[in-house]
Design a protein with these regions (language model features):
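Short, surface-exposed alpha-helical segments at coil->helix boundaries
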Residues: 28-35, 90
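Short phosphate-binding loop-to-helix
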Residues: 49-62
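Conserved donor sugar-nucleotide recognition element shared by glycan-biosynthetic enzymes
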Residues: 14, 27-31, 56-59
């Protein structure tokens, strides 16, 4: 399990504490929280934890370091990440692994957001899901990050991730939503 403390960690701590009051989350890394969750709910533990990363890019590079340090060869990696950040995580991994490594994306949920009167809400309840405002905030931050331009994380910008094709309909929807929600 990979995850230190980043921009979503405090919210994750609150959600875990609310859903599982017996799991103490104060000052825990994301990996430590998921380890405690696995132990509490399923009675099992991960073999390895990476707890120092502070962002999606570190998650990838520190994961690869962990695999190398423990002499763990791989031909494929399953990425199971918060769906709002799944595509960026895969693009980060793609930047650092060889072309013959298979990246399997397994988003941990699939959320549909609908209009509920004057507000947004989830079409279905998803256990442990972000509050809708936080989810929209996360989503609105992803398109600028995924962009391969001078401001984005792609090779033409900060070069944190591999190139990602963003469909035109997604770009148009983002521009429309930005007028209401801002870009982050």
């Amino acid at each position: 399990i990979v995850g230190g403390a980043g921009h979503t960690t405090d919210t994750l701590r609150q959600v875990v504490q609310l859903e599982y009051p017996s799991i103490e989350t104060t000052d825990l890394s994301e990996a430590d929280m998921f380890q405690k969750y696995l132990k509490h709910v399923y009675g099992c533990e991960a073999d390895y934890l990476e707890t120092k990363s502070t962002n999606c890019g570190n998650n990838i590079t520190y994961l690869l370091d962990l695999l190398e340090e423990n002499n763990i060869p791989f031909k494929s990696i399953i990425l199971s990440q918060d769906a709002s950040m799944q595509r960026r995580m895969a693009a980060g991994l793609k930047k650092y692994v060889k072309d013959d490594v298979t990246i399997i994306n397994y988003a941990t949920y699939c959320a549909s957001v609908i209009s509920c009167g004057e507000e947004l809400c989830y079409a279905e309840n998803i256990h442990g899901m972000w509050p809708i405002e936080r989810y929209v905030n996360l989503l609105m931050g992803e398109i600028p990050r995924l962009s391969d331009d001078e401001n984005g994380y792609g090779p033409s910008g900060k070069n944190y991730i591999a190139h990602v094709d963003i469909p035109n309909n997604v770009k148009l929807a983002f521009e429309e939503l930005k007028t209401v929600f801002g870009s982050e």
